[in-house]
Amino acid sequence: MGNYKSRPTQTCSDEWKKKVSESYAIIIERLEDDLQIKENEFQELRHIFGSDEAFSEVSLNYRTERGLSLLHLCCACGGNKSHIRALMLKGLRPSRLTRNGFPALHLAVYKDSLELITSLLHSGADVQQAGYGGLTALHIAAIAGHPEAVEVLLQHGANVNVQDAVFFTPLHIAAYYGHEQVTSVLLKFGADVNVSGEVGDRPLHLASAKGFFNIVKLLVEGNKADVNAQDNEDHVPLHFCSRFGHHNIVSYLLQSDLEVQPHVINIYGDTPLHLACYNGNFEVAKEIVHVTGTESLTKENIFSETAFHSACTYGKNIDLVKFLLDQNAVNINHRGRDGHTGLHSACYHGHIRLVQFLLDNGADMNLVACDPSRSSGEKDEQTCLMWAYEKGHDAIVTLLKHYKRPQDELPCNEYSQPGGDGSYVSVPSPLGKIKSMTKEKADVLLLRAELPSRFHLQLSEIEFHEIIGSGSFGKVYKGRCRNKIVAIKRYRANTYCSKSDVDMFCREVSILCQLNHPCVVQFVGACLDDPSQFAIVTQYISGGSLFSLLHEQKRILDLQSKLIIAVDVAKGMEYLHSLTQPIIHRDLNSHNILLYEDGHAVVADFGESRFLQSLDEDNMTKQPGNLRWMAPEVFTQCTRYTIKADVFSYALCLWELLTGEIPFAHLKPAAAAADMAYHHIRPPIGYSIPKPISSLLMRGWNACPEGRPEFSEVVRKLEECLCNVELMSPASSNSSGSLSPSSSSDCLLSRGGPGRSHVAALRSRFELEYALNARSYTGWPQSVGTHTNPGLSLEEMNRGAQYSAVDKYGYVSDPMSPMHLHSRRNSGSFEDGN
């Protein structure tokens, strides 16, 4: 029994065929080299062969630097049969070789000059003469794919089964290169279809491996070729076409009248089904199972792998794994002779999407494998986690820990190994750290090369002022760069975090440098010289974040101002999603919506963003961004999410903007995400939210991503609401609390135009807006007790409300929101960390 961890990816015959391919490439290169005549020599030779007088005066001993005689040159430079005849009558030998090892006949055959070939043969050239690599003229004709030349040579006595230095016949070569017409001619002249090459490979093996269906049919027709012939590693043709995914050849060979043995094994114990699964050939595997039954499904190779294990080793075709699991003969927790499962195989090769799929479908991560190379008294039992750790697949280690126990049970970088000695493994693993460092260096070098020069900054160009924010990446400063007030996101080195800051930095810069939209934060440049100096510089947005405005400064905005912000954010997101390479933000929340002093908004912070095409495995394995605003499909990691995940987050931001409350403020972020994902709970929609917007909200946070609207539709509907804001405002009955019709029609003008709301101006209307909202609900005694006058102070309004307008956390809430009733019964946390 072999050790799975030492399973070779290439067989001995693979290595041999690679050498054979290289040798034939060298032969072709040498032939081309002989036929490349220098320009000055070529003109002289054209004159010699174009003039009888010049030809008669030329010396028979004439040779080029590459050793070509006049006979060779006649084949290379446009000579004719009379020149050939004359030169040979004068005693020039046709057997003379060039320095590259070829006689004149080989050059004539390679150039497919039938006239010269015939003339040389009639004048005494040896049709069986071997040149470089033991190749005869017939081999050269087969390599070049010249069927007429092949026929002429065979008519003049060439041995149809002659073998070269690697024991390939012309039929081997024709099958290898896919020359169908040459194959037909060779078969017509009696070529042996079952002759073996150096490693026992027949022409049928070669054609099956290369996928030349018509040649396979030519070889098999009339029961000429042995369809069950084995090479030195016991491969049959079905092994090769299954391995390389040639479905049409597999179907042809599995015809009942050909009597192919579909469950035959090679010296490694692999059936054709094993090889199809090792290479992710779903259609081939399905064909084999449907036509031949399930016998191959239960066979183990010498590395303790069934076909299911093989599919997990390949790991990139989950549909194939699903198909195999649907067969009654397959158990997801089947253990090979060494104890390893399909989950072990997937973990060892770093297939994180497959690992998650297997775990979700009942794979047992606590089953252990043993090292077969150890004696029975030295058991080294290892779970799949240890296999992943050994290969440096730290993301899989973290994922397995997540499935093993709640996230907060152990420190984030430790995991107790079950089935082992109880020791802890830390993340990153040694190999994982090396992989990460190598990838990071490559990413930085690539970014430096691709980033336009105008975005390259030196740290000396930046003037740092006060700190305006911080995060796991480092700190954000206000500063000055190139005569602009800017925000500087300064990264710090973090060697203990499994999530690479360098990776995040490179991704964010590569995305920001391609963005240009008034509703997306403007990129100024980045410092790339050294990881210790990494910094991203963007425009400074003076109004701060929407989160700060709503929940720290506790400002109340009128409906028009809210809609202006909502439209701007939707426009920014629409831009991201409509790019040639669409970008998914993945972290859209009120922290990352920044406000100008004029009340407009931009989308910011692209540290978690990805180009949609590059999501691949990362798409399934990360929970990017803030849990409280996370789409269910992202939180559950149950499917490949799309740009519609951003629409869900936007809907929560819109609700937050309209109500002034944090979504599920009574819950921790993870609990809020779990409630939305698993219990389909959504924030309550109060009467203060206009009906057109409430309808948009419900569609935006639809559990099914396909049911959510595109941002283009969101923009259109919100702009309609903005133009009709007077008709939707709860306070529209009192003109003192709303904008004039003319100003509401200005809402679609370009930024900075007249009639714009100003965040600073809104602060003076804070108490008035609250009073207007409270007055509009005086008919609802359950919600509001004492009537509140517009001129009352914040403290007086708090005392006058049955349910506090400003709670103990300092948040102002919609008095009609059902969240009040819930929050009074639940004490919760406003912590918004991941």
UniProtKB/Swiss-Prot annotation:
Subcellular location: Nucleus; Cytoplasm
EC numbers for this chain: 2.7.11.1
Disulfide-linked positions: none
Record-annotated active site: 587
A GO CC term attached to the entry: cytoplasm
Gene Ontology molecular function: any one: protein serine kinase activity
Binding site for ATP: 468-476, 489
The UniProt record lists the keyword Transmembrane helix: no
Post-translational events: Autophosphorylated.
Primary location class: nucleus
Chain spans, region Disordered: 815-834
Catalytic activity: L-seryl-[protein] + ATP = O-phospho-L-seryl-[protein] + ADP + H(+); L-threonyl-[protein] + ATP = O-phospho-L-threonyl-[protein] + ADP + H(+)
Coiled coil segments of this chain: 21-49
Keyword field: ANK repeat, ATP-binding, Coiled coil, Cytoplasm, Kinase, Lipoprotein, Magnesium, Metal-binding, Myristate, Nucleotide-binding, Nucleus, Phosphoprotein, Repeat, Serine/threonine-protein kinase, Transferase
ANK repeats: 66-96, 100-129, 133-162, 166-195, 199-229, 233-262, 268-297, 303-334, 338-367, 380-409
Biological role: May play a role in cardiac physiology.
Family affiliation: Belongs to the protein kinase superfamily. TKL Ser/Thr protein kinase family. MAP kinase kinase kinase subfamily.
Subunit-level organization: Interacts with TNNI3, ACTC, ACTA1, MYBPC3, AIP, FABP3 and HADHB.
Protein name, UniProt field: Serine/threonine-protein kinase TNNI3K
Protein species of origin: Mus musculus
Name of the gene: Tnni3k
